[in-house]
């Protein structure tokens, strides 16, 4: 039949053919605009198939044109029969259905790739999937099968990455490239569908069974309209005349009588699945504005509201949102303000819960207070912890970190008001407020001031006292003593030391020592550290306290260096700086160790323990101080070992020795570039007696500018280098002098004659120098024969090594022949193992006696001609 004589049913086929033509043109345009290079081959295949299909359609339309009127009657009848048979058996699919079939096929290919762990296949199919879903977003709706596929693929990718961290087996190169490609693309892609993905992960069955499709964001938006900024007051005015309804469509009314019921429902739903926390916060903010509201209701609403805000920072969230933190800080300040005004309402931990939501509680007979269950100190601690987490996550080199750090002032005011409130509660013994609560809040206050300079602490205290009324005062830290930071730290530390035990007591002591060392009170801080005996028990404390101990130890060492006590500074810093793990021990960074198996949980805990940047101790300055002290001690010691074998094995700093040996092995040494190079070249100059050159190298280190009183420190270092240069010179050249005038040494090292005499006298009294000081002629008279020559010292070295070789061989032989009765006997009964008497053949000399004792000093190589030469 001709198409001009068809009935009304043909309109559907015409519309479907028009859809196919539009689909073909849209496909061709999109394929021309495709940007992914990896899919060029696939697109070319699709274009070829589209061209073939379009050519078939054109041929069909031509046949349906003029040529079909030239057909015979028989042909037309046969064709009508074939068409009727095809219509009875063939199901015509629309273009949209075809696209859905292609989408499902691609998803199944991705699932097959997941089963065989073929990430190259997954990467290609994932790109193809994203191109296909663009064509299906006609009404800005993403198919649920697509949402399910990308969510499952992201979970599978995270599992694969986690397995790769803990398993030593690596992927091949192709698979690894595919995994990296998927990791880069899927995170960027899934951000556009995060709402649908979250809904799917909360309840997959409900998401897939729901009728309405979740709207997906448009991939390409040509025109963007920005929503006008609406203030809170304007939004409230716009909402007038409207009522809030619940999920069942009933109007929700917030009245003073229903506040406790709403709070009960919110508290019971906390922690449950699919709970909208932001909606709960909005409800409680509305309850907080209900008028009239009693103090009890206000306290209950604020407690629940603050806890709900903290829930936003719990779980997998990196940190609490900034606006919620500031809102929680304001709510906590409002809570403390209410408790300060309403003296008959108290928040204590041991109070009973009020169960009757239909009526308000009253003060029981015979009591003065209405007790509300809760803990103010726990809220303050959580607020403090959230600020620390936020500072850990912010880049410290940005202005955002400085802006966030300003919130510490308002937090300190809240801690101070909380301390005043707990002091008020402790006055009444009937409330039975535990001492531990007061200790915890004092410890938080101490944690915020112990590492700050006295001027900053003074400003914090002044601002805190301005926030409270003029009549308010503290028994622990009176208002009259708020101007002296040293007294404040001393009072807080002594209070905790007397009224607490365990970790809090140890932390209080360490905070006081840190503050004293920071303000150049070296001898006080050293005596407190020694009398506390914390170095003996610190291993039994938690990791946070051990970190504080390490920080305090470093600060004491830096204080000793500023005082010019080089030996004390080096000994104090040796434990931390000699390990090479300063970052880890001071909680200022995570050390990436080779071949270490660190679980994700351990890595997360390690990052949580890191200190915020403003609390860090400069590691470059610390290394510079340690290496400088080691140089001033090691260079004279190395010069002394050249002529005195008794001190040969004494090493003050192994770290410094390794650096010095590595520097000496360098064929060419360029100008110093960093702190370590400056110290190494200064060491080389000092060992050669060029103390002026060594001083110039040390003074040119720019890190000294970070220390207070920079010029005083440089002057102190110059004097130390002069004295140690004098000692090094005497150790090196003593064997070549008979007498040496004090005036000569004074002019060489530009030291006062009295200072030179004092240094020489100290060396003689410590038996470091075999000489005598003639005060009449002001000369140093050296004794000959005491110091060994170079040949004698080398001969002793050879004898020591030969002796140790013999002992090692004998021990090895005894271990190999252990248990054998006649291990050392020979056929002619001459054996080295028969030590009960007799002679040893062929080993030079005889040994008599049953079991002769070894000579002291370890140099007992006495056999053969070499032994006789050494003895002679």
From Swiss-Prot:
Species in which this protein is naturally found: Neurospora crassa (strain ATCC 24698 / 74-OR23-1A / CBS 708.71 / DSM 1257 / FGSC 987)
List, alphabetically, the GO terms of the cellular component aspect: eukaryotic 43S preinitiation complex; eukaryotic 48S preinitiation complex; eukaryotic translation initiation factor 3 complex; eukaryotic translation initiation factor 3 complex, eIF3e; eukaryotic translation initiation factor 3 complex, eIF3m
Q: Where is the composition biased (Acidic residues)?
A: 16-59, 72-87
Main function = Component of the eukaryotic translation initiation factor 3 (eIF-3) complex, which is involved in protein synthesis of a specialized repertoire of mRNAs and, together with other initiation factors, stimulates binding of mRNA and methionyl-tRNAi to the 40S ribosome. The eIF-3 complex specifically targets and initiates translation of a subset of mRNAs involved in cell proliferation.
Q: Which residue windows are transmembrane per the record?
A: none
Q: What is its main location?
A: cytoplasm
Instruction: State the protein's name.
Output: Eukaryotic translation initiation factor 3 subunit C
| Basic and acidic residues bias spans | 88-100
Sample GO molecular function, one term: RNA binding
Could you tell me where the Gly residues compositional bias lies?
A: 831-848
């Amino acid at each position: 039949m001709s198409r001009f004589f068809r009935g009304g049913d043909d309109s559907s086929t015409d519309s479907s053919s028009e859809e196919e033509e539009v689909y073909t043109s849209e496909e061709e345009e999109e394929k021309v605009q495709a940007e992914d290079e990896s899919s060029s081959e696939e697109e070319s295949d699709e274009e070829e198939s589209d061209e073939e299909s379009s050519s078939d359609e054109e041929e069909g339309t031509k046949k349906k044109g003029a040529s079909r009127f030239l057909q015979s009657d028989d042909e037309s009848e046969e064709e009508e029969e074939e068409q009727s048979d095809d219509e009875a058996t063939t199901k015509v699919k629309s273009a949209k259905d075809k696209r859905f079939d292609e989408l499902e096929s691609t998803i199944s290919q991705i699932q097959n790739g997941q089963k065989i762990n073929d990430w190259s296949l997954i990467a290609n199919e994932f790109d193809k999937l994203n191109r296909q879903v663009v064509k299906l977003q006609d009404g800005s709706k993403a198919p649920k099968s697509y949402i399910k596929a990308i969510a499952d693929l992201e979970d599978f990718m995270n599992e694969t990455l986690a397995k790769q961290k803990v398993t030593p087996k690596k992927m091949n190169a192709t698979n690894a490239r595919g995994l990296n490609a998927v990791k880069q693309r899927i995170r960027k892609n899934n951000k556009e569908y995060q709402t649908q993905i979250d809904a799917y992960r909360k309840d997959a069955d409900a998401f897939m069974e729901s009728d309405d499709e979740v709207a997906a964001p448009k991939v390409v938006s040509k025109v963007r309209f920005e929503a006008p900024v609406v203030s809170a007051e304007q939004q409230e005015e716009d909402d007038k005349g409207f009522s809030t309804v619940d999920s069942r469509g009933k109007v929700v009314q917030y009245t003073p009588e229903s506040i406790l019921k709403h709070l009960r429902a919110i508290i019971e739903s906390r922690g449950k699945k699919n709970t909208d926390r932001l909606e709960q916060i909005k409800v409680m903010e509305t309850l907080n504005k209900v008028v009239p509201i009693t103090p009890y209701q206000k306290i209950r609403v604020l407690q629940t509201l603050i806890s709900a805000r903290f829930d936003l920072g719990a779980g997998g969230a990196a940190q609490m949102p900034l606006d919620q933190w500031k809102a929680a800080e304001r709510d906590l300040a409002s809570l403390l303000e209410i408790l300060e005004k309403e003296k008959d309402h108290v928040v204590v931990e041991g109070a009973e819960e009020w169960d009757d939501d239909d009526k308000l509680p009253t003060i029981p007979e015979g009591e003065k207070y209405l007790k509300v269950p809760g803990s103010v100190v726990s809220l303050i601690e959580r607020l403090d912890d959230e600020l620390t987490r936020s500072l850990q996550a912010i880049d410290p080199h940005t202005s955002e970190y400085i802006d966030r750090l300003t919130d510490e002032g308002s937090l300190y005011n809240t801690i101070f008001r909380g301390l005043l409130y707990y002091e008020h509660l402790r006055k009444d013994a009937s409330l039975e407020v535990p001492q531990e609560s007061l200790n915890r809040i004092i410890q938080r206050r101490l944690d915020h001031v112990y590492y700050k300079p006295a001027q900053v602490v003074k400003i914090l205290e002044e601002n805190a006292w301005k926030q409270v009324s003029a009549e308010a005062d503290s028994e622990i830290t009176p208002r009259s003593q708020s101007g002296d930071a040293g007294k404040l730290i001393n009072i807080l530390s002594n209070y905790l030391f007397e009224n607490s035990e365990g970790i809090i007591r140890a932390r209080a002591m360490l905070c006081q020592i840190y503050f004293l060392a920071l303000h150049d009170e070296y001898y006080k801080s050293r005596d407190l550290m020694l009398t506390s005996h914390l170095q003996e028990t610190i291993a039994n404390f938690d990791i946070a306290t051990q970190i504080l101990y390490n920080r305090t130890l470093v600060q004491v060492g830096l204080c000793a260096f500023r005082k010019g006590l080089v030996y004390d500074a080096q000994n104090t810093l040796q434990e931390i700086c000699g390990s090479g793990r300063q970052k880890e021990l001071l909680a200022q960074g995570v050390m990436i160790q080779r071949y270490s198996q660190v679980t994700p949980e351990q890595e997360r805990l390690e990052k949580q323990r890191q200190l915020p940047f403003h609390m860090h101790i400069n590691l470059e300055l610390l290394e510079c101080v340690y290496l400088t002290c080691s140089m001033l001690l090691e260079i004279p010691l190395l010069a002394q070992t050249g002529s005195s074998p008794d001190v040969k094995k004494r090493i003050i700093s192994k770290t410094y020795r390794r650096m010095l040996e590595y520097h000496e092995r360098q064929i060419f040494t360029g100008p110093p570039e960093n702190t370590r190079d400056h110290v190494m070249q200064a060491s080389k100059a000092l060992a050669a007696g060029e103390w002026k050159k060594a001083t110039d190298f040390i003074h040119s280190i720019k890190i000294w500018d970070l220390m207070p009183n920079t010029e005083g420190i440089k002057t102190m270092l110059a004097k130390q280098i002069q004295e140690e240069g004098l000692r090094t010179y005497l150790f090196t050249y003593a064997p070549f002098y008979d007498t040496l005038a004090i005036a000569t040494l004074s002019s060489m090292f530009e030291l006062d004659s009295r200072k030179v005499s004092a240094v020489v006298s100290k060396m003689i009294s410590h038996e470091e120098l075999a000489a005598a000081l003639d005060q009449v002629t002001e000369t140093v008279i050296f004794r000959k024969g005491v110091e060994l020559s170079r040949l004698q010292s080398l001969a002793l070295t050879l004898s020591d090594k030969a002796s140790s070789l013999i002992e090692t061989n004998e021990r090895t032989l005894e271990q190999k022949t252990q248990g054998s009765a006649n291990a050392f006997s020979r056929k002619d009964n001459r054996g080295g193992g028969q030590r009960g008497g007799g002679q040893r053949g062929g080993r030079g000399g005889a040994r008599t006696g049953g079991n002769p004792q070894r000579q002291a000093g370890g140099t007992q190589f006495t056999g053969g001609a070499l032994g006789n030469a050494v003895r002679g």
